[in-house]
């Protein structure tokens, strides 16, 4: 069995879909389907079993058997960078991860979990070293806290453990995320509604729409996860991005080009985001490459085209 926590979410459901495509249906999904629309992400997938996230953690803490488990992909978390309830965030993102990590170590089960580029905050250097880690929000801190906790164990592991620091991920099956969905999702909706894409005016010394992020295709994130599963000798914390920052203007033009029409409107930079916004991110892939991973990552032109082609063919994952 392969366990995927957050398996009905954005990256998790794409992982389940790819596992199915590779012939794996022995997948246990763990999630919280209070928001039932997430279930649509799994409508075209086959799974072996499902557990609510609270029931699952109770199950493993009680040391009840789940049968042979090949690997745990831990993607379940509160990923809202605008959430400031620290107690809620730490319970969901830190304490849950800690319990699952020890459960896997006790059973020698590979544990591949989701960290985040939010740990870097406003830094201009994005290498996996403590001196560059200064999160700007409690979400980023909750991810950093677990990375710090894990580092204490890296020299004495019983099985593979990998944390992937995701940069700005986009792709199908993110429609349930609302305001936290990628800019591709929002640009697509805006174009359909008004014929315009809205971008922030300049900030932090960047011109209008020239803020830069490392936008990474969800399919590449999934391929990297499965590469890691095939390389159990690799453990550690690694960036997951393309290694190339691109402007929001460039991303907007990639979406406009797919639709064949549209204009850009620049709107004032929100007051509540000042001092809490990453105007520049770019994954340093040196450590990932040194670990032997030679996977190529899609540029935004390819990734956006693949994304919008996919959702055009599958209304259930269409931006709305």
Curated annotation (Swiss-Prot):
GO terms for molecular function: ADP-glyceromanno-heptose 6-epimerase activity; NADP binding. The keyword Thylakoid does not apply. It catalyses: ADP-D-glycero-beta-D-manno-heptose = ADP-L-glycero-beta-D-manno-heptose. Its EC number is 5.1.3.20. NADP(+) binds at residues 10-11, 31-32, 38, 53, 75-79, 92, 143, 169, 177. The active site is at residues 139, 177. Substrate binds at residues 168, 179, 186, 200-203, 213, 277. Binds 1 NADP(+) per subunit. Keywords: Carbohydrate metabolism, Isomerase, NADP. GO terms for biological process: ADP-L-glycero-beta-D-manno-heptose biosynthetic process; carbohydrate metabolic process. The keyword Phosphoprotein does not apply. Pathway: Nucleotide-sugar biosynthesis; ADP-L-glycero-beta-D-manno-heptose biosynthesis; ADP-L-glycero-beta-D-manno-heptose from D-glycero-beta-D-manno-heptose 7-phosphate: step 4/4. Its cofactor is NADP(+). InterPro entries: Epimerase_deHydtase, Heptose_epim, NAD(P)-bd_dom_sf. Pfam families: Epimerase (PF01370). Belongs to the NAD(P)-dependent epimerase/dehydratase family. HldD subfamily. Contains a large N-terminal NADP-binding domain, and a smaller C-terminal substrate-binding domain. Catalyzes the interconversion between ADP-D-glycero-beta-D-manno-heptose and ADP-L-glycero-beta-D-manno-heptose via an epimerization at carbon 6 of the heptose. Homopentamer. This is ADP-L-glycero-D-manno-heptose-6-epimerase.
